Design a protein with these regions (language model features):
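Canonical P-loop GTPase G-domain recognition
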Residues: 183-241
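Short, often N-terminal, low-complexity regions
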Residues: 3-7, 12-13, 34, 38, ...
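Accessory interaction regions appended to the cores of large information-processing enzymes
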Residues: 209-211, 238-242, 272-654
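P-loop NTPase switch module centered on the Walker A-proximal segment
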Residues: 47-149, 153, 193, 262-265
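Conserved Switch II/interswitch segment of TRAFAC-class P-loop GTPases
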Residues: 129, 140-160, 172-174, 180-188
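Residue-level signature of catalytic and energy-coupling elements of molecular machines
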Residues: 65, 71, 103, 122-124, ...
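Conserved beta-strand/loop subsegment of P-loop NTPase cores
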Residues: 145-148, 170-179, 202-216
Length: 654
């Protein structure tokens, strides 16, 4: 009826023209309105209104590893957007090398699919709360969310995090219960848990009235009945079209768009991505760029890109409601506003949660510095961190009194370790300190961050895990046995109590436990410290290649981090002592050879395999007087003071 009302009074040729548009081709109709048809301005307005009615902007949010990226693969494939030339796809949205290795989404991505006459812009967001800065800024571009929940696990801590963000933006959810074909699926329980979660988060009546779909993203089917085991994704496409509202935007007003994320192309430079909230944009159009601090610059749009499938497609013009990318803007930042020069109206800056964890990044001063990396100096380190700040909105970098040290703060250990991993792959060498939580003062009271922790363990490991979390000042909030030999424990734990806990947890549960944690709130700081590492370090007293004979004699004292032939230096931690104290050792000691024939035969040297740390494990292991040396080829643990007499002097001064 609405469309019929819009068409009333138009000439037959104009009505005929409206039947042939699809996707971006509708832009050409707008530009063709000067062909002599009557009511051409009205025709232009009607076409734009119809275009907007056919757009859906939706984000997929969920807990890590519940199947977001796999679901996007199926939507792209079954909509026909990719076409036959792409063949079968697998996690196409995880384009980053680290994402494919770890099986997690780190950066939010944009794509668009054509389904029937609808254009559906999809944003795939990270599930880890450490990348919450990504989640928060992309929610400003969409009108609804697909909330993906595992049919066995139900809502998890990070489901709560991203859902809370969506509700704060006033978005209505479409609940998708994924992995419905998984053994032990309990969709009824999951729906109840999801409803309870929404209620606790203060959802409105409209947000509580959510549609539910049951899917298997891996097998490519969806349905309205929990017993569905075949079919395709049509029910999900239909639900998106029916329950996600079209963008509430003004297509005829002066141009306005907020930059939500950034990309980079070596040919065109920085690319600003966002949703047009008002008006239209075309190539070579003059605009005003308003920075977060209110500073204004005149710029000119170079190129305009739309999203389709896996590609960015250059278009002549784009209209309000669509998610686009523009090139040609000099040094854009997230939260900047692009406006019509005659109507400069900046949008409110995007709010991002403050960091909770900090580390010190410093120049590598170890004896082997410069052997592996290309970028070593404080100037190169500073430039790299400043580049990261442009698009990593949840990151903070501060310079201290020492020009070779930078205090880097982020949303969690994973957030910072991903940055470090990217830097070492780019050829950077640096040393980093143990992660520390950030304390804040509120109303005269010192507060620290608390995290909601969910652990899923076998019942035989329950006692050890509860004792360990208790010693780290955790409060047990809930305990739910699943009736099949496992139990889920919910805790509230100070963030500093979780630093270094992951490795201990995996040891306690023999590798069978699952642990998830997410920032909850800042609360009153608890008195006393967290118990330090129980084992001391074995520290090398010389520089050279480690020898098997020396390591064979040292392994009685603890676990080794090096193997025969590895180069070590004075002050490097080469093992974990079996006792609490540090021990200075000589891993270079060779067997003394004499000209006296021994009565017995030599002992066969049998070495226990050395512990090889990942970056996260090394950061968890170190104490305050230690650093992790990060290079493109190696991850080493070392003491801050490499010489033994320096360590003794520092120890006396403490």
């Amino acid at each position: 009826m609405r469309i019929a009302g819009l068409l009333e009074g138009l000439s037959p040729p104009a009505v005929l023209y409206l039947g042939c548009w699809s996707g971006y081709c509708a832009i050409r109709l707008v530009r063709a309105c000067g062909m002599g048809f009557p009511y051409n301005r009205r025709l232009s307005s009607i076409i734009l209104s119809l275009m907007i009615q056919q757009i859906r902007n939706i984000a997929i949010i969920a807990h890590v590893d519940h199947g977001k990226t796999t679901l996007v693969d199926q939507l792209l494939q079954q909509s026909g957007t990719l076409g036959d030339r792409f063949g079968p796809v697998e996690r196409v949205m995880d384009s980053n090398e680290l994402e494919k290795e770890r099986g997690i989404t780190i950066l939010s991505k944009n794509t668009a699919i054509q389904w029937n006459d609808y254009r559906i812009n999809i944003v795939d967001t990270p599930g880890h709360a450490d990348f919450g800065g990504e989640v928060e800024r992309v929610l400003s571009m969409v009108d609804s969310v697909l909330l993906l929940v595992d049919a066995v696990d139900g809502p998890m801590p990070q489901t709560r995090f991203v859902t809370q963000k969506a509700f704060a933006h006033g978005l209505r959810p479409i609940v998708v219960i994924n992995k419905i074909d998984r053994d032990g699926a309990r969709p009824g329980w999951v729906v109840d848990q999801t409803f309870d979660l929404f209620d606790r988060l203060g959802a409105s009546e409209a947000q509580l009235d959510f549609p539910i779909l049951y899917t298997s993203a891996l097998n490519g089917y969806a349905g309205l009945d929990e017993k569905v085991r075949s079919g395709d994704m049509t029910p999900l496409f239909r639900a998106i079209v029916e329950h996600c509202p079209p963008p509430q935007v003004d297509p005829n007003g002066p141009f306005q768009m907020q930059v939500s994320t950034l990309a980079y192309n070596s040919y065109v430079g920085a690319i600003a991505i966002g949703r047009i909230t008002r008006g239209r944009v075309r190539r070579n159009m003059p605009v005003t760029l308003v920075k977060r601090d209110g500073d204004e610059h005149r710029e000119k749009i170079g190129q305009v890109f739309g999203f389709l499938g896996l590609q960015r497609i250059e278009v002549e013009e784009a209209s309000a409601g669509d998610i686009i990318a523009v090139a040609g803007i000099e040094a854009p930042n997230v939260s900047d506003t692009l406006c019509d020069p005659e109507h400069v109206e900046p949008l409110p800056p995007l709010a991002v949660d403050e960091p909770t964890v900090s580390m010190t990044f410093q120049v590598n001063t170890a004896p082997f510095a410069g052997r592996d990396g290309k970028y070593l100096t404080s100037r190169q380190l500073k430039e790299r961190l400043e580049r990261e700040l442009i698009h990593n909105v949840a990151l903070r970098v501060e310079e201290g009194n020492d020009p070779e040290k930078f205090r880097v703060s982020g949303r969690g250990e994973l957030h910072l370790s991903i940055l470090l991993e990217n830097m070492r792959r780019e050829g950077y060498e640096l040393a980093v300190s143990r992660p520390e939580v950030i304390f804040r003062e509120r109303d005269g009271e010192i507060c620290e961050p608390y995290e909601q922790v969910t652990v899923d363990v076998e019942e035989r490991h329950q006692g050890g895990v509860m004792e360990a979390l208790g010693s780290r000042r955790g409060d047990l909030k809930d305990m739910v046995p699943d009736g099949r030999g496992r139990v889920r424990l919910d805790y509230l734990v100070p963030s500093r109590g979780l630093i270094g806990f992951q490795t201990e947890f995996m040891t306690l549960t023999s590798g069978t436990g699952l642990m998830y944690h997410v920032f909850d709130h800042y609360g009153a700081a608890r008195q006393g410290g967290i118990a330090p590492r129980r084992n001391g370090a074995m520290i090398s007293n010389s520089t050279g290649k480690a020898l098997g004979y020396a390591l064979f004699n040292l392994q009685e004292r603890g676990r080794l981090f090096v193997k025969p032939g590895d180069e070590v230096y004075e002050g490097q931690v080469v093992g974990m002592h079996s006792r609490e104290n540090d021990l200075t050792v000589n891993p270079l000691k060779a067997k003394q050879l004499t000209n006296i024939r021994a009565a017995g035969s030599d002992e066969n040297i049998l070495l226990t395999p050395a512990i090889v740390f990942s970056l996260e494990q090394a950061l968890e292991f170190i104490e305050e007087d230690e650093l992790v040396e990060v290079t493109p080829r190696s991850i080493r643990v070392r003491k801050r003071h490499l010489k033994e007499h320096e360590r003794k002097r520092a120890g006396k001064g403490m």
